[in-house]
C-alpha cells in the first residue's frame, strides 16, 4: 500500500492512465474498478473465453505430460522438474524429493518416479474431474509434477494450515511452506474457471469469514499473502498460456484475490490496483481492544453494511447506532468485522475482554 497522502493523491489522479499502461494486454477488457462478485464474474468469463485449446491427458500428440516437462522445469535449460510438496533431494528417501529428471515419469504409482498431481483433487470436484477426455480434469493450470508416493500420500485430502515441510496432518494435508501459495492460487483459478464444479469450500479446512459470501476459505487467502508468487510460477503461467490460451490471474497479480475475497493484503504486482482502492484506506475502526463500544470512522452510515464474525466464521448479532457499535454483549475473545461500502470491503480484527 502507498502510505503518503501526496503519493495517494497523485496515484488516484493518474490511475486511469496507469491502468492502461501497466496492466497486461490479456486483461484489457476487465474493469478493475469492480471488486467482489463483479470482478470475479469478469475474470471468470475471461478465463473461459480465452481457454481455446483443451489439452488431452495422455496422447500420441501434445498432451499434459509434454506441457509439464516444459512448464514445471526447475529453471530454464534444466533437465529436472520441480516436484510440488517436495523438500529434500539429499537424503535416501525418494518420496520427499524436490526435483527429478523430466523423463523419470510414470502414470502409475512407482517409487522414484513422478506423475501428475491434481492440486484440486479429482474426487473433490462436483462432478468429479475426469481425464478420459480433454476438459476440466486435464487443465494444466491444475496439474503439477509430483513424486508418485507423495501424490498418493496427499490423495484427496483437504488442505489445512500448518508450517514447515509438507505432510499429512490428521486426516488433512499441509502442502509445505514453499508451495502453499502455489496451491492457493491454483485453487482460486479453478474456482473462477469452473465455478460450479470446483468450489474451494470442498477442498480447504477452516473458516471462510474473510470473504463476503463465505465462498473462499481463509487458509487460501492467508497462503496467497504469506507465500508470494515465485519466478517458477510466473514462467509456468506463461508456458501454459502458450498452450491453452488462458492465464492464472492470481499468479499475474495476487492482489486480485484481496479485491474479490478480502483477507490479508498481498503484493499488488502491477502497482496500480492497490493505489486505486482509496475508499478502503479511509475507513477505520477504534479501539481494537474494548469491553463496550467500537466506533467506525470514514464512511456514511447509510452507505455501508457491517457484519461481525467469531473465530468459527459465524455471523453475530450486535447493536449499531450510527458510527457506534455496542459489543458489550459479546463473549470475551477475538472477532472480525467486515465493513462493506459499495462493492469494496475491509476487514478489522478486535478483541473483547
Cite the ranges covered by each PLM segment:
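Short, glycine-anchored, charge-dense loop/turn motifs used at functional sites
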Residues: 308-316, 335
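N-terminal module-boundary/linker segments of secreted carbohydrate-active enzymes
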Residues: 22-93
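Short coil/turn motif common to extracellular beta-sandwich-like domains
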Residues: 287-295
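Bacterial Sec-dependent N-terminal signal peptides
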Residues: 1-25, 275, 347
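Residue-level detector of functionally pivotal "anchor" positions at catalytic/ligand-binding pockets or at interdomain
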Residues: 264-286, 299, 304
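Glycine-centered tight-turn motifs at strand-turn-strand junctions
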Residues: 315-330
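C-terminal tail/sorting-segment detector
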Residues: 4, 318, 334-353
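Domain-level detector of nuclease and nuclease-like folds
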Residues: 105-271
Amino acid at each position: 500500500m502507498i502510505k503518503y497522502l501526496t503519493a495517494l493523491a497523485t496515484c488516484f489522479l493518474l490511475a486511469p492512465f496507469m491502468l492502461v499502461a501497466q496492466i497486461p494486454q490479456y486483461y484489457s477488457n476487465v474493469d478493475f474498478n469492480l471488486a467482489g462478485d463483479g470482478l470475479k464474474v469478469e475474470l471468470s468469463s475471461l478465463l473461459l473465453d480465452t481457454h481455446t485449446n483443451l489439452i488431452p491427458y495422455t496422447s500420441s500428440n501434445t498432451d499434459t505430460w509434454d506441457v509439464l516437462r516444459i512448464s514445471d522445469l526447475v529453471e530454464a535449460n534444466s533437465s529436472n522438474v520441480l516436484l510440488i510438496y517436495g523438500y529434500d533431494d539429499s537424503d535416501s528417501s525418494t518420496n520427499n524429493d524436490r526435483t527429478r529428471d523430466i523423463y523419470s515419469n510414470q502414470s502409475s504409482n512407482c517409487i522414484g518416479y513422478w506423475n501428475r498431481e491434481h492440486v484440486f483433487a479429482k474426487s473433490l470436484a462436483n462432478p468429479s474431474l475426469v481425464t478420459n477426455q480433454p476438459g476440466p480434469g486435464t487443465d494444466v493450470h491444475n496439474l503439477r509434477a509430483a513424486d508418485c508416493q507423495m501424490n498418493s500420500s496427499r490423495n484427496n485430502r483437504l488442505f489445512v494450515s500448518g508450517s514447515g515441510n509438507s505432510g499429512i496432518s490428521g486426516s488433512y494435508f499441509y502442502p509445505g511452506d514453499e508451495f502453499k501459495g502455489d496451491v492457493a492460487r491454483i485453487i482460486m483459478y479453478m474456482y473462477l474457471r469452473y465455478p460450479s464444479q470446483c468450489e474451494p469450500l470442498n477442498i480447504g479446512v477452516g473458516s471462510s469469514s474473510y470473504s463476503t459470501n463465505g465462498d473462499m476459505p481463509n487458509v487460501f487467502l492467508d497462503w496467497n499473502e504469506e507465500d508470494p508468487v515465485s519466478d517458477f510460477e510466473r514462467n509456468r503461467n506463461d508456458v501454459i498460456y502458450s498452450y491453452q490460451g488462458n492465464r492464472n490471474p492470481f499468479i499475474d497479480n495476487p492482489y486480485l484475490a484481496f479485491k474479490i475475497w478480502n483477507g490479508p493484503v498481498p503484493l499488488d504486482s502491477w502497482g496500480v490496483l492497490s493505489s486505486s482502492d482509496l475508499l478502503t484506506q479511509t475507513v477505520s475502526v477504534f479501539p481494537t481492544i474494548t469491553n463496550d463500544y467500537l466506533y467506525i470512522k470514514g464512511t456514511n452510515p447509510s452507505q455501508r453494511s457491517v457484519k461481525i464474525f467469531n473465530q468459527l466464521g459465524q455471523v453475530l448479532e450486535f447493536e449499531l447506532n450510527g458510527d457506534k457499535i455496542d459489543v458489550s454483549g459479546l463473549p470475551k475473545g477475538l472477532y472480525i468485522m467486515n465493513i462493506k461500502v459499495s462493492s469494496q470491503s475491509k476487514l478489522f480484527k478486535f478483541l473483547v475482554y
